[in-house]
Amino acid sequence: MCSSDLLFLLLSATALADEVIHIGIIQFAEHGSLDNCRVGFIEGLAEEGFVEGENVVFDVQNAQADTAISAQIADVMAGKYDMICAIATPAAMAAFNAAEDAGIPVIYTAVSDPVSAMLAGADGKNPGNITGTSDALPVEAQLKLIRALMPDATKIGILHTTSETNSDATLALYKELAPNYGFEIIDKGISTGADLPMALDALLPQVDCTTNLTDNTVVSYLAVVLEKSEEYGKPVFGSEIEQVINGCVASEGIEYTELGRQTGRMAARVLRGESAEDIPYETISNSYLYVNPDALAAYGLTVPAELSERAIDVAAE
């Protein structure tokens, strides 16, 4: 590198450090996994030198699981900030639509299937000034877990919001893989959280257990799901650690704070001058086995010896 190039980089870095960057964060709903993504995103940026209160200002807005509110927030943010971080698929879709004309980058996280959400192409290329991280569930690992804990089970119930693209893609994968493990998937769609009690009354008598997707509406109303499932004596398998902490029996899930940190590091690359369009979206490949001993005991379930070594007791966390 010649001296003039080095001088340019040093001057650019100094200018970036002196500039206060404004980032809007749209969180689609308020629940543990998305909260952890937000915390991790801010931590990941801080690790890269973009520190809240020093050279970054964050405006965090929650859409309360409402796609219309997501769009309104995104429209406002696109006109006033340097970057938008969108947490969950509906927020990411709204942010991309709003920011496209404004020319500001969108960094998303907790998007289960960026391709089906049209946030990435089938070839992995981004459709515009957008990139981020996917929280694609380890579906096969979850099916193996359910089979290990419930060797006689044949039918798994899945609740999903019909307007959430992320749920559609994961549900399709469950239906594709379930027969390999001797399961049939029975699903029930809802429009809003208010639909859950009736949907559960229809679904639970037909199944041996239920497993959650990263469906924002269902997860936001997890207490309703757990209460109804207890009435019917049907265990609920979660899709991440927070759900297990709150009463699901177990989960093969990713670590959402780390997913957020990974997203923050990607955002730092964009803030340093890389184009979001040129950065392929990323995933986390590691899954962790989380168990809730009290919930397992309530349903008479035990973790087999071959899984116990890697099982993480959420009560000890």
Put a short name on every predicted segment.
Residues 6-7, 16-17:
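Gram-positive cell-envelope targeting signals
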Residues 1-3:
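Short, small-residue-biased leader/transition segments that mark boundaries at the very start
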Residues 17-317:
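Short hydrophobic alpha-helices and adjacent helix-cap/hinge residues
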